[in-house]
């Protein structure tokens, strides 16, 4: 495999050839009978088979009976030296040994070849292109000795077929020889290597030598005695037992043919593609080309037989199933035999040997450049050119159970053989290739985060090793051989065992020291006090007047120090409390300081902190920053993550009753999963961040946390009261359930007077500490909040009406039009469903139904339609670029994840750099996005967040602008979202823009939200109000519906342009804080948002206008009456249509066919807006020239896909409105362009001056003129130089083509009604809506047979021909055919006309024919 520097690798081979050769010979051929004579370094021995050979002295012990014969030989030498002869007893003993070896030698060899069965990876049937190694590379490769462990492996273990026993780390060269130079010269002269003389003996089996000794299917060896004979493949090194092969299942003829012509294994018989993989691509050699024998082997006559066998038999890897020619593995004639034996023994290729583990992840890829471009193309390659790019790649992968430190580059073919599914999935993602200028793996993935356990040289781990003190164990860091660690930026379940880093790698070594010391801190942690802590000193002696010295993460503000002392006092008096500071004042820092004081002074731990999932990482970071001496653990994520924390950090192995941590941070979503663990321990302090989650005493979180044992409870919330006072009482009940009952307090304070108000404040005061930014921060940046009212686009209006009109029965129940038997809960659920659909429509119509989007439009027009579909996107396309140009950084909050998806597409279209996270984002993704946005000189200008997930507990003070896309029912959610930017650390004025749609449910939502804000600070009002009641939902739905269904509204649509948006931003930047009035501060009220009226910012709060002239109960009646009126019209049209179908009246038609209907009913309008009623004007592009012209005498084509149902008078339209109908309706209101004509049209040129004569108003607007010849085809819409952006109803392509041609050739084509040049069917004076006929392309009245196309027999015959080729259902075609036949059977009456008119018409026809002929000639 090519290395990372794209150089060819050297082929290496093991240095013990006998170890890999001996198992392939019979016992008689490898059992030494006696030693004949001895030289300096070799012995001449005789085997039981009668063969004599020279063997090195140090290799004699590898042969059977070699040591025994050596002892006999040494004994014989000693006797010969002293006595000069050998006794008869010695000869008898030698003969006895020979007999024993002959009888038992084969049995011993069979016992030594027993194997374990194992399974390999998936098969991949593709040929491997071999690596081409030159003779110089092979001969110059250096040799290296075998490892000592391999020499100590006994014969039985060495022959076991198991990947664990293969020498994967063998680094010796395959192409090298371990002979000296003198020995090489002698072997070249002899043409044979002395220890390979067996290969050239008579009757040597080369087939057996080139095949593996293990069955591919059952992994068993050959046993002839039991009938398990091998069947050898003729094309590769695979072998099968006869019963395991497919031969028994074949018929007799096929089986005989295979036995005569050779057996081909299933892998070779398949038509596998000869892919252009890495090695062949780089070297220019492929197995698909004509076979080229390396010259070093072709010139050797002694190897001719071996080379001939190697031409047809290739090595096939057991694991990846690739094949490769043996002589491409090693072209050195002195070592090729050793290389063949090495691979046959090992069973796997080089890449499988180096990387035995499965693939976990594919990270990147890169393309290899061929060293021989002329040879890189394959003549016999079955792979298409488009697939070559995938097979000429290298992939950067990570193995299972390995860290990112051990990633490696691998070939495409090897990866396909090991993990084909992963490769296909990765290739389908269309990832960009590897960029050498950027790191493939983030640095954080290779830095140690936590050390869970270690293993010392003694074999013991950190918990079983015995050390006297923590210092002794800390010094033993040099004894650590492996460590079980997690990595920064990765989840805990990706932890693995790794050797400690080297000291030269400073960053990794520093992290390793920190992780090891934290592990020891956890192991040597002191036991938590079990008894309650009693303090005899008065609190005045304990109070902090300055910041404690052990709090070193930063400087506490004066109000934060007061908050620390207040929490300390609550704990001192054993009184639970609520820290209710406004968002952005640093409640987290105050709580961490409080925990530090308890631990430093009183050794008070453990502490349990419950936080939202989005803020877990932030809490862990702040705890490590402000209290580094605390042992902190986080219980979050999947079960694998939490199990690691439980097993290695929380539960003390020596004393399971005590927890081995000071602070445990757990997400609120995991409390239920880990409740059994939390109940085991007595927690000194229980802290709940975002304590408003406990507002419902029936929630599971309230129930489970109430069962956790704790000495002191503390809640953190910036919004203690959100909807009603009962929620506030529930918080107090959670803190002190023994003294406070929420239900009783609610009954007690249901009726409020002055005395009870004072009493209620006395109850709440000991629990709360509430401060706002304006009270404690002097130079805090101001905040300007502005509501931007918008008008719905036509698409939104249509969908809005449709949603309300579809729920007739429900609306009748609400307004009292019909009796109802359904319960109130069912009605409330239905109302909520309607409300959600309306809110989706107001956010973006694509959220309501994705089918509204036309996916066949060009990209530019598709994005234009996306903007024009929603009024909020229309203002964003003006507002966001201007804010970015002014240097603002923006946070965009939405409650719909689908809207964030749409915004992502829009930002990509606008090339705006952004970050995003929502509820589905992982913890690492969230923190990474926050860090990237807050980084100095960050290129990100926008941040997309969901209101619920991104509105709590995160710091985004680097942003100075907040845009709320859709208001929340709970105003505190929006306030928390705003507080992400308007918080401590902000240095700029914060601009807040809230987008709301006028005359819609959003107005009522904002109004109700303002009431809740008032309730938050004026508890005495509306205590018994239920804001989720059916009445409130009805009022929200009712709001705006009256104005929407009014036939003529007095108020115009709100319009915004670049000037008005520029003025909006400028005025907002000049305004002061919306809540800086002293009266608001003293009364502790929230300031209301100000409303932009397109001229200035109103100082009044947002007031919702209600029409007091109409009774509230009559709103739905107006809607119902309108819907019933429409239904009656539909019914009347249907009855009339049926009546016309039954009455077959004969209608008079003229002979001539006029393609233009020039009557006064034709209406054309100028569409100079984005869409009808849109407040955002867009410039209309005019057509300046035509690049292509008319074809040569082309006839009008009729689309065969036209729905023939429209010919029938029986109409099935106007059925129940569903989502599909709404999608079609909305599509017709979006920006659309005519689609390409499905017929091939040949265009020719035409003189414009001649065309002007043809298209003059003299001929076009004459109602008496009728065409006699075939209609002329006009060029399609796409050929016009400047694309005219159409917004409006979708029109017929023929109508648009005719209109654009005539309007571009002549300036006199104007409407006869209004005198304006406009699109067909868009006349502003039109009262009766006309429809465009799909047959003739002209507008005319429907309901009668008025189409000019039906007046001409030739046109009717064309329609019948087109109908016969149509794919419409047979019954529809039958009806349409009968209809057309009825037109043909009607009597024709001559047209009565005066002679003057006849002469005038004939003269016009003659002039027109001459003009057309002249145009054709040109």
UniProtKB/Swiss-Prot annotation:
ZnF (PHD-type) ranges: 212-271
Source domain of life: Eukaryota
The Helicase C-terminal domain, residue ranges: 875-1034
Chain intervals annotated as zinc finger (RING-type): 215-269
Domain (Helicase ATP-binding) ranges: 568-738
Matches recorded under SMART domains: DEXDc (SM00487), HELICc (SM00490), PHD (SM00249)
Family: Belongs to the SNF2/RAD54 helicase family.
Subunit: Interacts with clr3.
The protein's name: Chromatin remodeling factor mit1
Species of origin: Schizosaccharomyces pombe (strain 972 / ATCC 24843) (Fission yeast)
Gene of this entry: mit1
